[in-house]
Amino acid sequence: MNFETIIGLEVHVELNTNSKIFSPSSAHFGEDPNANTNVIDWSFPGVLPVMNKGVIDAGIKAALALNMDIHKEMHFDRKNYFYPDNPKAYQISQFDEPIGYNGWIDIKLEDGSTKKIRIERAHLEEDAGKNTHGTDGYSYVDLNRQGVPLIEIVSEADMRSPEEAYAYLTALKEIIQYTGISDVKMEEGSMRVDANISLRPYGQEQFGTKTELKNLNSFSNVRKGLEFEVERQAKLLRSGGAIRQETRRYDEANKGTILMRVKEGAADYRYFPEPDLPLYEIDDAWIDEMRAQLPQFPAQRRAKYEEELGLSAYDASQLTATKALSDFFETAVSLGGDAKQVSNWLQGEVAQFLNAEGKTIEEIALTPENLVEMIAIIADGTISSKMAKKVFVHLAKNGGSARAYVEKAGLVQISDPAVLVPIIHQVFADNEAAVADFKSGKRNADKAFTGFLMKATKGQANPQVAQQLLAQELQKLRD
């Protein structure tokens, strides 16, 4: 029997606000354990949460970016559970009235077609702390993450393969990153994914029993975990077994999933309205204010690059990988840079430099103005394409004017025949054996002179001009 795969994803995104959702503590990543905490995070008796308006701003932006309806009257709920990293014994979240609902995004499939994935809801909540189990037999709790604002984005079960899940996550991360509400760095925990997967016989409308997957710390592991579950569940069903509703974690070492616990339902959390927070009214003016702050998103930018600038679909996709890169490209083109030339540099030398340095384009000294100027002095013959690579590295590390650096460093190409011809004659005088080989008709003897000339000019001879003049002077030798 063959089965249809049904996948839905729950994505937790940490919002990059300066302070936490209900306390004034810093929400920044990477501090010493428990450095970013106060009495609200510790849940001291009598302390009350205070809503961070910036979190609602971010929630509205996310809902708009994901084509969602927005609840105009929004409230919070308590999700009750006991765990050491949750000192209140409940989490403040949203249950029946999330900030956003009924949304969708498009994903690109492997065959080039587009599929719409519906999004059920996006709700705001606080993150939990972090437990660390030491080798000394003790467990330690770090509450720096406690109260950091999250938005949880819950898709409908519209994905039919691990590849579609991967494509959805890629598109979602791209959109969220463009809004500026999160850096969506999985390695720092600011984007976390739980996957729900079930199988059903083809033709059956009712969903099968789902399994939840956790510990998916990369998009690649999401795909691998789902692929393993497809095989595990299909094998179990074909042998007459039944799927339990359970939570499993992906074990990267064993390339498989391991049972964590039998899955709880919503009733186990005993949700009820949060009594310490009021109802929040989100009016049209607030929504319009947030909409005005949103940028043009990747899909629209890709279409513009292809249709208006004549770039390939591949180039457009690479240039919109991050908002910072796309903004850099657009600024360079607006300054007069040729779109294809700018694209080639960003995908070539710039990308190689960023990978080698482990940096993003915002973290280096190169500016769109620098790059456009450098491309211009390549075009006018001031420097060669080969020399430009050296110039680029200087600009990436130090910034400044490309032309000023080239002139100061003595890197300007020699294109004047009045300068080059005497150097060519000196090359002939210094390489009598090569001249003799050329005069005797030895094959390819003329090619050696190009290297001699470039060495004599320390690589500054304009290659095109040098080739023309060499051919001219060599012909005189032959005559």
UniProtKB/Swiss-Prot annotation:
Its EC number is 6.3.5.-. Keywords: ATP-binding, Ligase, Nucleotide-binding, Protein biosynthesis. GO terms for molecular function: asparaginyl-tRNA synthase (glutamine-hydrolyzing) activity; ATP binding; glutaminyl-tRNA synthase (glutamine-hydrolyzing) activity. Heterotrimer of A, B and C subunits. It comes from the Bacteria. It catalyses: L-glutamyl-tRNA(Gln) + L-glutamine + ATP + H2O = L-glutaminyl-tRNA(Gln) + L-glutamate + ADP + phosphate + H(+); L-aspartyl-tRNA(Asn) + L-glutamine + ATP + H2O = L-asparaginyl-tRNA(Asn) + L-glutamate + ADP + phosphate + 2 H(+). GO terms for biological process: glutaminyl-tRNAGln biosynthesis via transamidation; translation. This is Aspartyl/glutamyl-tRNA(Asn/Gln) amidotransferase subunit B. Belongs to the GatB/GatE family. GatB subfamily. SMART domains: GatB_Yqey. It holds the Pfam family GatB_Yqey. InterPro entries: Asn/Gln-tRNA_amidoTrfase_suB/E, Asn/Gln-tRNA_Trfase_suB/E_cat, Asn/Gln_amidotransferase, Asn/Gln_tRNA_amidoTrase-B-like, GatB, GatB_C_1, GatB_Yqey_C_2, Gln-tRNA_amidoTrfase_suB_CS. Allows the formation of correctly charged Asn-tRNA(Asn) or Gln-tRNA(Gln) through the transamidation of misacylated Asp-tRNA(Asn) or Glu-tRNA(Gln) in organisms which lack either or both of asparaginyl-tRNA or glutaminyl-tRNA synthetases. The reaction takes place in the presence of glutamine and ATP through an activated phospho-Asp-tRNA(Asn) or phospho-Glu-tRNA(Gln).
